[in-house]
């Protein structure tokens, strides 16, 4: 019985079925198995309407007539239009007659010359030129103020000299290995030299305040390099790249946590003056050749490897010693008077650092860590790491 009712779902109801109750939605009645809504014809049949049609009475067919335009009405209008056109024709002919025949244009006396020298010609073509990176230190009106500011900040951002003695699980040799690895990272991702200098500064300042186990030293270096990249680079590598370079020794969460810890320890003071910045300042005040500049940068980076003895010197002093030694090696010139006036450093001020740097330069080829030396063998830096150090200094 239930199956039969289901099969009768779409069968129209009998003629005598009552109409649907008021208030129910008929559209949902079919879905619920209720009676279908009767059509207008069936409703009229039940109400007794249309009986004449049901009795077989035939209605007369009807036609729709469309009035044709009255031709007689249009004729006077057309005649009036033709009369007006005929009246205007003589005036139009007279107007055309005054113009006369069309004559060719006479050539211009002075033809416009479209030469390359014409100011009306503008070259709007786009030429691709190598854009030089602007030097933020090269502001003549503020050079003195910038140098004074850097000298003040280098004292505030200086790491503690003997912090490694208080580290229970790491040594200067481990730090040297870490910095050497960061040099390779910088070359791999084509980072700025300033990024490397900043990262080493962050590491030394962090280790001056926090004890670190040797298993976490690389994590500190990775997070410091990440911070320096964000501070200095236009397009810093992603965090995943820094996780990758550690051979997945640490995960992304660990790197970000260490980055957060370094920021807290450094009190978010990331704009630390570096040797690289002071060298840039010196190059602006004392013009020199590209080889001297590259050798100065090479000597400055060599001091990043060894915490002892270079942590006891300010970056401005190390930069002065590097400039003097590079200039002496290439050109035979010593500390110039122009830089003496700008920095206030005499040769006696930089002499202790200069002696230490000279010893480092002499032993660079025998040093265990060779990444910096390999870096400066390239033509980009004029292969200055292959230049032999002078045996003695004329001080």
From Swiss-Prot:
InterPro entries, alphabetized: Cyclin, Cyclin-A_N, Cyclin-like_dom, Cyclin-like_sf, Cyclin_A/B-like, Cyclin_C-dom, Cyclin_N, Cyclins_cyclin-box
Cellular compartment(s): Nucleus; Cytoplasm
Pfam families from the UniProt entry: Cyclin_C (PF02984), Cyclin_N (PF00134), Cyclin_N2 (PF16500)
Gene Ontology CC entries for this record: cyclin A2-CDK2 complex; cyclin-dependent protein kinase holoenzyme complex; cytoplasm; microtubule organizing center; nucleoplasm; nucleus
Primary location group: nucleus
Comp. bias regions, Low complexity: 27-60
Domain of life: Eukaryota
Keywords: Cell cycle, Cell division, Cyclin, Cytoplasm, Mitosis, Nucleus
Keyword Ion transport: no
SUPFAM superfamilies the UniProt entry points to: Cyclin-like
SMART domains the record matches: CYCLIN, Cyclin_C
GO BP annotations, alphabetical order: cell cycle G1/S phase transition; cell division; G1/S transition of mitotic cell cycle; G2/M transition of mitotic cell cycle
Region (Disordered): 1-93
GO molecular function, one term: cyclin-dependent protein serine/threonine kinase regulator activity
Family as reported in the entry's similarity comment: Belongs to the cyclin family. Cyclin AB subfamily.
Annotated function: Cyclin which controls both the G1/S and the G2/M transition phases of the cell cycle. Functions through the formation of specific serine/threonine kinase holoenzyme complexes with the cyclin-dependent protein kinases CDK1 and CDK2. The cyclin subunit confers the substrate specificity of these complexes and differentially interacts with and activates CDK1 and CDK2 throughout the cell cycle.
Complexes and interactors: Interacts with the CDK1 and CDK2 protein kinases to form serine/threonine kinase holoenzyme complexes.
Protein name, per record: Cyclin-A2
